[in-house]
């Protein structure tokens, strides 16, 4: 029962991490900067994500533009794209494997493959969390270095966006959930199919042979009236 509860907790945390990873990948709030004008109506906020960059006006208007050229993007952005996409794919595969391997499901019930699927799902969740952690950590380091670079003008400096914080939380949930899924399968005994005990067989190899009297005593019977003489000797003894 405790192992089942640990599996459910691990799957729930991993599933939340997968959802957070998807949202982090889509949101444009990876880098943000704010330029406030002389009037509150002229306040503008710039946002940059993996797939688009947006401009938010104080009037509530969003204007987003998708990146047109892939080769024109910086290398850190291209690497973050690849890492986050792979992390999302691994999270989806891990979710399917974990559903099959959990004890509360009927898929592959009573087979050793069920434990294998649970361990595989936990391992993939851990790998997905690591990839997401690397992507958001790399981007955060790049943002911090550029922010404290005195050679860059203030208009080109960005701050850490909300999507990076969400990425850290999501990757942590995936790592914790995947670890719980793997640990919940360690205490289980290996599956062994039931084997009926062998039946007792009767062997005649050690039984004693039937007793047979010697041939000399075959005719050693009590004398009858017709075959015995008056002296008590049998007539057959003289034949």
Swiss-Prot record:
Give the intrachain disulfide bonds: none
The UniProt entry's GO CC annotations, sorted and at most eight, read: bicellular tight junction; endoplasmic reticulum; plasma membrane
Region ranges (Disordered): 196-228
* Any GO MF annotation of the entry: identical protein binding
Q: What keywords are assigned to this protein?
A: Cell junction, Cell membrane, Deafness, Disease variant, Membrane, Non-syndromic deafness, Tight junction, Transmembrane, Transmembrane helix
The Gene Ontology biological process terms listed for this entry are:
bicellular tight junction assembly; calcium-independent cell-cell adhesion via plasma membrane cell-adhesion molecules; cell adhesion; protein-containing complex assembly
**Residue ranges, Extracellular compartment?**
29-81, 137-162
Q: Which domain of life is it from?
A: Eukaryota
Q: Which Gene3D superfamilies match?
A: 1.20.140.150
Family per similarity comment: Belongs to the claudin family.
What is the protein named? Claudin-14
The beginning of the lineage is:
Eukaryota, Metazoa, Chordata, Craniata, Vertebrata
């Amino acid at each position: 029962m405790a192992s089942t509860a640990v599996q459910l907790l691990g799957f729930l945390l991993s599933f939340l991490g997968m959802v957070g990873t998807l949202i982090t990948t889509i949101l444009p709030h990876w880098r943000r900067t704010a330029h406030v004008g002389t009037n509150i109506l002229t306040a503008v906020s710039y946002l940059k994500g993996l797939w688009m960059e947006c401009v938010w006006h104080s009037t509530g208007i969003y204007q987003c533009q998708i990146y047109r050229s892939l080769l024109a993007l910086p290398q850190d952005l291209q690497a973050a794209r690849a890492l986050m996409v792979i992390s999302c794919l691994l999270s989806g595969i891990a979710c399917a494997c974990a559903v099959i391997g959990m004890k509360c499901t009927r898929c592959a019930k009573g087979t050793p493959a069920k434990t294998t699927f649970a361990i595989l799902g936990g391992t993939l969740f851990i790998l997905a969390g690591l990839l997401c952690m690397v992507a958001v950590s790399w981007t955060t380091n790049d943002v911090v270095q550029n922010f404290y670079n005195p050679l860059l003008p203030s208009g080109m400096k960005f701050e850490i966006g909300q999507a990076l914080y969400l990425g850290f939380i999501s990757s942590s949930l995936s790592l914790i959930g995947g670890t719980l899924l793997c640990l919940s399968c360690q205490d289980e005994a290996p599956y062994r199919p039931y084997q009926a005990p062998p039946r007792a067989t009767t062997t005649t190899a050690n039984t004693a042979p039937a007793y047979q009297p010697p041939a000399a005593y075959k005719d050693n019977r009590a004398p009858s009236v017709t075959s015995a003489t008056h002296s008590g000797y049998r007539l057959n003894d003289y034949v």
